[in-house]
Structure formats: C-alpha cells, structure tokens
C-alpha cells in the first residue's frame, strides 16, 4: 500500500531464454495497451534493463512509472535513477536453504513447503524516494 500498488498493477511475463533480452523486453513493453503504475522485477538487473527500455519508449522513471528491483545489488545504488530494491539477507537465506536440504535428505517423504524470510525495502529514486 505504501507504493499505491493495490490497484492497476499489471503482470508482465516474458519467455525465459530470450537470446536478445533487452530487445525482447522493449518489444513486450511496447505492446502494452496501458502501462501499470509500477513494476516489481525479479532482480535489480532486470529492473535496470526495464528502466532503460521505458526511457527509450519516452517514459520517465519515477515521474511516469515506478520500478523496484529485488536483491539490492551494489549496482542499484549507482544506477540512474538510483533503484529501489528489496534487500534479501543472504546469510539467513543460505542457512535456511541448507537446513531445508538437510531435512529433505534425512526425510525425503516430507511435503514441500514455502519458507518466508526477512527482507528490507530499500527506498531510492526509482520510486520517487
């Protein structure tokens, strides 16, 4: 709700394995009949490519559209505009993954489960902050 994303948020899925990813991203966005208020991307590098594509199409980030990455890469804070991102705690995620793997090895018949871990939203210029 902080971002005002509760209404009008669109989902964009692109086929994986694209040979020319930036061009494919550009072409996918160009076909949108209406643009969402914001994009939340799978990682910061996708978000940075998205910002470039939006700029080429005449959109301004954050004035027209907000963009948020995921993983809070070092590049996110040097990119223009500085990229809002979701910081994941690698040590916690690694510990949790190793724990799940060990449990699965010991008891392979256990049901799969979803695990949630702590993250932090790092607000920067790409969402108007």
What is the predicted role of each segment?
Residues 1-129:
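Bacterial carbohydrate/catabolite-sensing allosteric modules
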């Amino acid at each position: 709700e902080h971002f005002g994303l509760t209404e009008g948020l669109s989902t964009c899925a692109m086929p994986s394995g694209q040979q020319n990813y930036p061009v494919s991203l550009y072409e996918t966005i160009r076909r949108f009949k209406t643009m969402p208020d914001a994009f939340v991307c799978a990682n910061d590098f996708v978000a940075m490519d998205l910002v470039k594509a939006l700029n080429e199409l005449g959109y301004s980030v954050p004035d027209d559209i907000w963009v948020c990455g995921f993983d809070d890469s070092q590049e996110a804070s040097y990119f223009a505009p500085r990229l809002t991102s979701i910081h994941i705690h690698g040590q916690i995620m690694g510990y949790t993954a190793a724990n799940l793997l060990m449990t699965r090895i010991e008891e392979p018949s256990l049901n799969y489960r979803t695990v949630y871990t702590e993250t932090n939203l790092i607000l920067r210029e790409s969402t108007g902050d």
